Structures are given as structure tokens and as C-alpha cells.
Amino acid sequence: MSSLVTPQHAEELSTGARQLGVELSAQQHELLLGYLALLIKWNKAYNLTAVRDPDEMVSRHLLDSLSVMPFIHNDTQRWLDVGSGGGMPGIPLAILHPHKQVTVLDSNGKKTRFLTQVKMELKLDNLTVIHSRVEEVQPEQPFCGIISRAFSSMENFTNWTRHLGDSRTQWLAMKGLHPADELVALPADFTVESEQALTVPGCQGQRHLLILRRKA
């Protein structure tokens, strides 16, 4: 274990994952802590996250990302994390689902350099890092799932990514407060499939997950 990661961090991750109903193997637990160590190390120079205190990163980043894992369907193979920033939730998604192909996308070169370093150091062969604006990405085939965490408004999230999915794609928007005002401006060809209020161990404030579909 890296000197940047404490036994308390390890225990908080184990306990929190159990409370979320997410089963972690020993290898997944180790990889998540390895990711945390890299996040702590690189954040000092690269400003990857506004969370400066490493003791807050387990709950506000790792567990917050794990909270949506029960809603990731097993039969969805290709996922895109839009505006991934420091890698949430894309890196935890790739760690927990090694047989899924996960792409993390960000327009900030410092952040994609960090994500590339995480891919190399943790040997995440199922992870692809793209440095680009989302509007300029042209995938060979539609993604099965497109997810964002505090990326933009619901209107922008759906409009900017509509070309990356189809009627079979799930769009997952991770939000704090319920975005009722944003849903009013949702494009007409998108519908809300479900809304989930999430409780993240160690996190104050509201958390919501909205799952969307696009009409054919």
C-alpha cells in the first residue's frame, strides 16, 4: 500500500462498499486504493479535484462512484465517461468491470495525462483515454452506456452526446440536488427511464442518479 493511503482509507472503502451493496474482490480493493494514491499524488500539481483533503477522497470520489455500480447492467459492454476529469466514475467502473470496455473522455490535457498514467500504472487494459471535446468524438459504433458526473446541464449532456449513442444506449447523469429545473429543458427525444436517490457513506448532501433513453 502506498504511504499516501492509510489503513483508515482502506477500511473506509471496504465498509462503504459493503453499505452500498458493492462486492469488492481483494484485487479490486487494491486497485481502487492504488488509484486513490495516484489521485492524491497528482492532485497537488495537476489540480484534478477541488477535494484537497485525502481523508475526504474515499467518500466523495471512490464511494460516490461506486454508488452507481448497481445500476450498470451486465449486458452493456462499451461505456463512455464524459468530462471524466480525475477519472470519476470511469476508473472505478473499469476496475469493477474488467470485461467491459470503458472510455474516459476529457478536453483538459493535464487530466487526460493523469488518466493515461492511471491506465499504465494499474494496468487497466480495458480502459481507453481520449483527449478531445465531446462534440468532436466519432466512435465506430454507439456506446452502450454514457455516464457523467457533475459534467453539465442535462440539456447539454444529452445534446452534446446524442451522436455517441442510439435508442439502445443508457445515459446516466450523476447529480447532487435533483435537477428538476434542468429536466424541463431536456430534448424532446430523450425520456427519463428512472430516477434514483442515492445515499453515499460519509457524504453529506443529496445525490441523485437519472437514467435516460433516447427515442428511436
Swiss-Prot record:
Q: Which reaction does it catalyse?
A: guanosine(527) in 16S rRNA + S-adenosyl-L-methionine = N(7)-methylguanosine(527) in 16S rRNA + S-adenosyl-L-homocysteine
Q: Where does S-adenosyl-L-methionine bind?
A: 83, 88, 134-135, 149
**Main EC class the enzyme belongs to:** transferase
Q: Where in the cell does this protein reside?
A: Cytoplasm
**UniProt cross-references to Pfam families, sorted A to Z:** GidB
Cite the SUPFAM superfamilies for this sequence.
S-adenosyl-L-methionine-dependent methyltransferases
User: Main site of residence?
Assistant: cytoplasm
What's a Gene Ontology MF term here?
rRNA (guanine-N7-)-methyltransferase activity
InterPro entries, sorted: rRNA_ssu_MeTfrase_G (IPR003682), SAM-dependent_MTases_sf (IPR029063)
Q: Name one GO cellular component term.
A: cytosol
EC identifiers of the protein: 2.1.1.170
Q: Write out the entry's keywords from A to Z.
A: Cytoplasm, Methyltransferase, rRNA processing, S-adenosyl-L-methionine, Transferase
UniProt xrefs under NCBIfam families: rsmG_gidB (TIGR00138)
Q: What does this protein do?
A: Specifically methylates the N7 position of guanine in position 527 of 16S rRNA.
Q: Which HAMAP family match?
A: 16SrRNA_methyltr_G (MF_00074)
| Protein family (similarity comment) | Belongs to the methyltransferase superfamily. RNA methyltransferase RsmG family.
Output this protein's name. Answer: Ribosomal RNA small subunit methyltransferase G
Q: What is the lineage of its organism?
A: Bacteria, Pseudomonadati, Pseudomonadota, Gammaproteobacteria, Pseudomonadales
